[in-house]
């Protein structure tokens, strides 16, 4: 099995609910290690750049507005099959469709305020990790 790194963001809704520790506990219980982490309040420019892939989608403006509405917790998760593991922990994008016990089923309010973001593929993960953690501030554990 390959050790991977993936980007995870705990979104403003979940940060406001004070569930960062509960979400981190789920990552660690699944065998994922936090290799880098920081809290940030994204600027509009950062959010627009990060979600540029969605620029032409009808939800783009609402997504950017939501992501700049409060602080987020950004982390790099590391472990065997980290990308898939994180996506399984998160659950479906729409919390109404998310399996019981997933992060979104337990902490998200809507498809927009859905608690977490996670990279969807190895290539995406590499780009997303570099966006928020350029340079050498990620630590193998």
From Swiss-Prot:
NCBIfam families given in the database record: PRK00668.1 (NF001908)
The protein, known as: Nucleoside diphosphate kinase
Reactions the enzyme catalyzes: a 2'-deoxyribonucleoside 5'-diphosphate + ATP = a 2'-deoxyribonucleoside 5'-triphosphate + ADP; a ribonucleoside 5'-diphosphate + ATP = a ribonucleoside 5'-triphosphate + ADP
PANTHER family on file: NUCLEOSIDE DIPHOSPHATE KINASE (PTHR46161), NUCLEOSIDE DIPHOSPHATE KINASE DDB_G0292928-RELATED (PTHR46161:SF3)
Compartments reported by the entry: Cytoplasm
Sites where the protein binds ATP: 11, 59, 87, 93, 104, 114
Disulfide pattern: none
Active-site residues annotated for this sequence: 117 (pros-phosphohistidine intermediate)
Top-rank taxon: Bacteria
InterPro entries: NDK-like_dom, NDK-like_dom_sf, Nucleoside_diP_kinase
Cofactor section: Mg(2+)
GO molecular function per UniProt: ATP binding; metal ion binding; nucleoside diphosphate kinase activity
SMART domains: NDK
Enzyme class, UniProt record, top EC level: transferase
């Amino acid at each position: 099995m390959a050790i991977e790194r993936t980007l995870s963001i705990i979104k403003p809704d979940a940060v406001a609910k004070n569930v960062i520790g509960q979400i981190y506990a789920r990552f660690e219980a699944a065998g994922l290690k936090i290799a880098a982490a920081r809290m940030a309040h994204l600027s509009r420019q950062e959010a627009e750049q990060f979600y540029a892939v969605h620029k032409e989608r009808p939800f783009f403006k609402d997504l950017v507005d939501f992501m700049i509405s409060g602080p987020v917790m950004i982390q790099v998760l590391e472990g065997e099959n980290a990308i898939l593991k994180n996506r399984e922990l998160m659950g479906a994008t729409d919390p109404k469709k998310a399996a019981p016990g997933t992060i979104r089923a337990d902490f998200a309010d809507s498809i927009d305020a859905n608690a977490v973001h996670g990279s969807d593929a190895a290539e995406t993960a590499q780009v997303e990790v570099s966006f928020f953690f350029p340079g050498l501030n990620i630590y193998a554990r």
